Curated annotation (Swiss-Prot):
The complex is composed of six subunits: RnfA, RnfB, RnfC, RnfD, RnfE and RnfG. Binds 3 [4Fe-4S] clusters. Keywords: 4Fe-4S, Cell inner membrane, Cell membrane, Electron transport, Iron, Iron-sulfur, Membrane, Metal-binding, Repeat, Translocase, Transport. [4Fe-4S] cluster 2 binds at residues 115, 118, 121, 155. It comes from Tolumonas auensis (strain DSM 9187 / NBRC 110442 / TA 4). HAMAP family: RsxB_RnfB. GO terms for biological process: electron transport chain. PANTHER family: ION-TRANSLOCATING OXIDOREDUCTASE COMPLEX SUBUNIT B (PTHR42859:SF3), OXIDOREDUCTASE (PTHR42859). This is Ion-translocating oxidoreductase complex subunit B. It is found in: Cell inner membrane. Its EC number is 7.-.-.-.
Length: 185
């Protein structure tokens, strides 16, 4: 019985020593991150889609902080560009000099008759916009899909294609300056 108690005490002492060492290391060897990068990262949509040319939102936030253009986030859209411009204290790029023109909104579409239910697209989707179960057909939730195109390549049957969404009043780019509107007093 004494041996068991001794072993428990030794393990408790080791756990206490290692806990103190880890606590000391966490305090004294802490890596400080740039607060502007943290703020930029919080503004980005966190889809980790890679459409900006970076492997995720955090590396793109670091690139913006180092002077890269602020208009490469396609899923974030114009509102994200405006928020980043406000944070950085710069003017958002206008449509004429925009470095990366946002392509028309596209979403993934699964041809369900070709889907074998392998779940590779579900694993590749960064925003969980694909529902389905193994060995059953899968479906895309259009409202959740960001159009990142990451689900297309893993599909072994090529049953996923990117389709352009039709123009609707919700997504139409209204040019208010050319619409003849008269203010009624």
């Amino acid at each position: 019985m004494n041996h068991i108690l001794l072993i428990i005490l030794i393990f408790a002492a080791l756990a206490l020593i290692f806990g103190l060492l880890l606590g000391f290391a966490a305090i004294h060897f802490k890596v400080e991150s740039d607060p502007i990068v943290d703020q930029l990262d919080a503004l980005l949509p966190q889809t980790q889609c890679g459409q900006c040319g970076y492997p995720g939102c955090r590396p793109y936030a670091e690139a913006i902080a180092n002077g890269d253009s602020i208009n490469k986030c396609v899923p974030g859209g114009a509102q994200t560009i405006q928020n980043i411009a406000d944070l950085m204290g710069v003017e958002p790029p206008s449509d004429d000099n925009e470095l990366l023109m946002a392509p028309p909104k596209r979403v993934a579409f699964i041809h369900e008759n070709l889907c074998i239910g392998c779940t590779k697209c579900i694993q590749a989707c960064p925003v969980d916009a694909i529902i389905g179960a193994p060995k059953l057909m899968h479906t895309i939730l259009r409202s959740e899909c960001t159009g990142c195109d990451l689900c297309v390549d893993p599909c072994p049957t090529n049953c996923i294609e990117m389709i352009e969404l039709p123009a609707t009043p919700d997504r139409w780019k209204w040019d208010v300056e050319t619409i003849p509107v008269r203010m009624v007093q």
